[in-house]
């Protein structure tokens, strides 16, 4: 259901979801626990963020002093397109935060993006010190003025529109910046994304609680989501197919999996039901259908589910490649295709789901 909802959102362009404050707090805490000074004297850019509505801006503004930030920059897209699609969704307590500000100009407000800034001064800084002004353009992250802000920043943190995710990743990697973004687990299989994971330039973050991500949405798009996905009491939608993607280090990433031997898995792992590990028809590797069934004593290539990346420890395994489609690309797959035809991993002529090929580091 989660994957289907991401697809529906992308197709309908209803792809602006507002991240919950506790989810942001939980994720950021994982990096602070690993390195308490991770944000000290740094500039953070929050693009695609709609500061009037965003918990990202609220969170970092409220914790500006706690984190020792140098500067916080948050940009929003022009109000006209947002109001047309979604209606108003203010998260700041004062709903007149913009319209009563001396900078407010009703004749250009709908067409111009905004930039919100908070800068280190010789006094305690809090959210009330947040200043804003209009951008020259509409605030699109691809514009030259937002690119300049990107180049100024040390960190880029946001929940980019799902429909522009590939474009955003390309924009992000035009520079060598630290980043933390939200995306679909499906994005891992994109040809623009997986090589970054393979080369250890991007990995999964700490993750959402119990694998569930909840986002605020406007009521007028709630009809797009099934019962059990949208909660009309909270105005939240739930996705299970959602993750944080980052190049910031965190402790869980370096926790090796506790694994059983091949023989013990066959004997005790209830998911395997006593079955031997099988080799693929078309790749020199064995099929491991569950992450917790990876054998500790197997040194050759294994195919594992995409969800393995939630537990991936780079000191324990190396990622060789991935196959998720019928087409074969040696640069992506990383293994030789032994039989011509459908390149998806197969066992006894039956294809599996997408698989990542890994090998234990000796």
Which residue ranges define each predicted feature?
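Class I S-adenosyl-L-methionine-dependent methyltransferase catalytic core
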Residues: 1-362
């Amino acid at each position: 259901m989660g994957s289907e909802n991401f697809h529906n959102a992308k197709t309908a362009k209803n792809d602006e979801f507002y991240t919950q404050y506790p989810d942001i707090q939980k994720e950021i805490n994982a990096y602070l626990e690993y390195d308490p000074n991770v944000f000290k004297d740094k500039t953070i850019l929050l693009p695609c963020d709609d500061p009037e509505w965003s918990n990202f801006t609220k969170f970092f503004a409220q914790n500006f002093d706690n984190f020792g930030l140098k500067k916080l920059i948050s940009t929003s897209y022009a109000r006209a397109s947002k109001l047309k699609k979604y209606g108003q969704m203010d998260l700041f307590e004062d709903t007149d935060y913009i319209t009563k500000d001396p900078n407010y100009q009703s004749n250009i407000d709908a067409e111009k993006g905004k930039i919100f800034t908070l800068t280190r001064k010789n006094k305690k800084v809090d959210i009330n010190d947040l200043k804003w002004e209009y951008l020259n353009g509409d605030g699109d992250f691809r514009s030259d003025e937002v690119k300049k802000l990107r180049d100024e920043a040390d960190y880029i943190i946001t929940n980019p529109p799902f429909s522009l995710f590939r474009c955003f990743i390309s924009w992000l990697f035009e520079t060598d910046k630290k980043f933390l973004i939200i995306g679909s687990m499906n994005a891992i299989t994109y040809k623009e994304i997986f090589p970054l994971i393979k080369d250890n330039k991007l990995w999964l973050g700490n993750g959402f609680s119990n694998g569930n991500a909840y986002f605020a949405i406007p009521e007028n798009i709630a009809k797009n989501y099934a019962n059990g996905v949208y909660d009309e009491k909270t105005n939240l939608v739930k996705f299970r197919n959602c993750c944080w993607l980052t190049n910031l280090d965190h402790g869980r990433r370096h926790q090796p999996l506790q694994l059983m031997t091949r023989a013990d898995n066959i004997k005790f792992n209830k998911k395997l039901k006593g079955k031997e590990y099988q080799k693929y028809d078309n790749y020199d590797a064995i099929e491991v259908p569950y992450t917790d069934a990876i054998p500790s004593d197997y040194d050759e290539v294994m195919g594992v589910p995409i969800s393995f990346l939630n537990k991936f420890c780079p000191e324990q395994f190396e990622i060789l490649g991935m196959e998720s489609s019928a087409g074969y690309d040696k640069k992506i797959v990383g293994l030789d295709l032994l039989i011509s035809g459908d390149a998806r991993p197969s066992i006894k002529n039956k294809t599996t789901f997408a698989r990542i090929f890994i090998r234990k580091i000796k």
